[in-house]
């Protein structure tokens, strides 16, 4: 399970790191002054002389150092080489996107070396006469010793059948949390039993980092570089994903959120749901043109973790992923058309968007990517007094987006929006859809599609449980966010994406003068 909505120690440290990196960036110093501030951060977050979290204050500070480096876009350091925490800082002190792959990293000495899978008899065993656990074990790995069941770990295949039949729930089946959360099977153990990521499988969804109870996994960020841009006076737009609802309780209204974003340095604020409206119409056109004449099935393109998984794990289906631009790219490209010298920062729930923004075809549109959690750190680091923020009621709304566009933030929202648009154009046409959330279920969906079970369908995949509202960069409990999102959808100025005042620009953004609604 993830810990969104629960203020755990791991989450507190992660957010403190974001806050202190932001404070350092706003100080706007270079050279040795910057080095001093960076070296000071671990002592600010882990004060005193005694360790309280891992009983080793030096280890605790060393882990924070690696988190600080990653938050600034810097790589983790090798454990077998001497390297200062400030190594590479000068290269990172720029107002541009900065990090090299890999995006998601294991801090090796923070890893607890959890067993990959374990089935174990607990003290709750009553030593019952029936001992069904022994009877169902296919490997005869369970024996009777000292009046209770005992599992021979050498024979056990971790099937868990014994745990299922135990009437006292005395047998526990556990799995390494990060690996259990990874729908790609990309996490295994290294030679020392520490978690290791297979980057040939990883799609940077970030679910491992929010499910690790020891906070041993973190992704790289651009907090430092973004604020360098603010300090330089760059005109930077905040492109806010619709999943922002419920993430910032102190910024309950869109007006407050907009005021806060401008106060920390953004030039203006735009809701990415306007790009979702354009995406809906474009993807509906794609489906009508491609299925079934050219393609047996078509899959949506909005979630980068889903589309990357489809292309790497199912290369034969790569052509079935819609070529429609994602809402992030549609919105960024539109704003750059309006303000060519401005820069764009996507703010959303997603770690994988950082990877999407680094693609050759996208990097000229999107300059920075922040998660909601990183944004919370920046707001804290700026020392904003939320109560004193003045809201201009004439500019309180983010933009004009449809209910359907805002609904992209939850599982099923994309497919339903596209299907409803097709039905509106062709009332007699049946549009069959199927959706999955979480990469493990997404893989199952594509396996069935490959087997021909979904011919004629529109498939939607969301890499995170619940969709974007369950993304790795969110703060709030996804279930509560879903409730607030549905309220926000009802407050939209219109329901139909084609009513968007930006729809007339779609042919320009697609660079297709022949595109017609």
Regions found by a protein language model. Give the residues of each.
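Iron-sulfur cluster-binding cysteine motifs and their immediate structural context
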Residues: 130-153, 161-198, 203, 207-222
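N-terminal [4Fe-4S]-dependent radical SAM core
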Residues: 93-122, 139-140
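Iron-sulfur-associated redox domains of electron-transfer enzymes in respiratory
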Residues: 1-82, 219-517
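Extended, highly charged accessory segments
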Residues: 59-62, 66, 84-90, 97-102
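A secondary-structure boundary/capping signal
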Residues: 121, 152, 198, 240-241, ...
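Gly-rich Lys/Arg/Thr-decorated short loops/hinges at beta-loop-alpha junctions or inter-strand turns
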Residues: 112-120, 143-148, 189, 207, ...
């Amino acid at each position: 399970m993830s810990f969104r909505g629960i203020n755990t120690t791991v989450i507190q440290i992660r957010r403190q790191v974001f806050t202190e990196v932001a404070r350092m960036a706003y100080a706007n110093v270079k050279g040795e002054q910057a080095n001093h501030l960076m070296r000071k951060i671990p002592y600010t977050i882990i004060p005193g002389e005694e360790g309280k979290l891992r009983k080793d204050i030096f280890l605790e500070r060393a882990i924070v150092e690696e988190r600080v480096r990653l938050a600034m876009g810097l790589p983790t350091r090798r454990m077998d080489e001497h390297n200062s925490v400030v190594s590479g800082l000068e290269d990172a002190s720029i107002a541009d996107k900065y990090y090299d792959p890999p995006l998601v990293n294991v801090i090796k000495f923070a890893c607890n070396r959890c067993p990959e899978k374990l089935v174990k008899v607990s003290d709750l065993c009553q030593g019952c006469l029936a001992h069904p656990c022994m009877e169902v074990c296919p490997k005869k790995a369970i024996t009777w010793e000292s009046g209770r069941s005992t599992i021979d770990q050498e024979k056990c295949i971790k099937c868990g059948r014994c745990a299922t039949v135990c009437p006292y729930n005395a047998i526990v089946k556990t799995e390494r949390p990060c690996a259990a959360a990874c729908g790609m099977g990309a996490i295994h153990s290294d030679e020392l039993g520490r978690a290791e990521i297979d980057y040939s499988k990883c799609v940077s969804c970030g679910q491992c980092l929010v499910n690790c109870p020891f906070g041993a996994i973190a992704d790289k960020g651009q907090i430092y570089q973004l604020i360098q841009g603010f300090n330089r006076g760059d005109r930077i737009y905040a492109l806010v994903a619709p999943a922002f609802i419920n993430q910032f309780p102190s910024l309950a209204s869109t007006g407050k959120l907009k005021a806060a974003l401008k106060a920390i340095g953004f030039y203006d604020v735009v809701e990415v749901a306007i790009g979702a409206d354009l995406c809906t119409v474009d993807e509906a056109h794609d489906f009508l043109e491609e299925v079934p004449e050219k393609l047996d099935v078509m899959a949506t393109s909005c979630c980068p973790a889903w589309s990357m998984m489809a292309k790497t794990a199912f290369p034969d289906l790569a052509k079935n992923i819609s070529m429609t631009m994602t809402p992030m790219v549609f919105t960024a490209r539109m704003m750059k058309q309006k303000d060519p010298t401005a820069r764009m920062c996507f703010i959303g729930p997603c770690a994988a968007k950082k990877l999407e923004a680094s693609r050759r075809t996208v990097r000229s549109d999107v300059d920075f990517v922040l998660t909601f959690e990183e944004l919370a750190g920046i707001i804290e680091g700026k020392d904003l007094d939320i109560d004193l923020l003045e809201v201009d009621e004439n500019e309180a709304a983010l933009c004009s987006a449809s209910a359907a566009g805002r609904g992209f933030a939850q599982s099923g929202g994309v497919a339903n929006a596209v299907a409803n648009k097709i039905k509106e154009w062709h009332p007699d046409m049946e549009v069959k859809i199927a959706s999955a959330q979480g990469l493990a279920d997404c893989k199952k969906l594509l396996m069935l599609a490959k087997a021909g079970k979904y011919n004629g369908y529109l498939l939607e995949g969301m890499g995170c449980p619940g969709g974007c509202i369950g993304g790795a960069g969110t703060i709030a409990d996804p279930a509560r966010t879903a409730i607030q999102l549905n309220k926000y959808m009802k407050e939209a100025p219109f329901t139909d994406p084609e009513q968007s005042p930006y729809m007339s620009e779609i042919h320009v953004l697609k660079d297709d003068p022949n595109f017609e609604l």
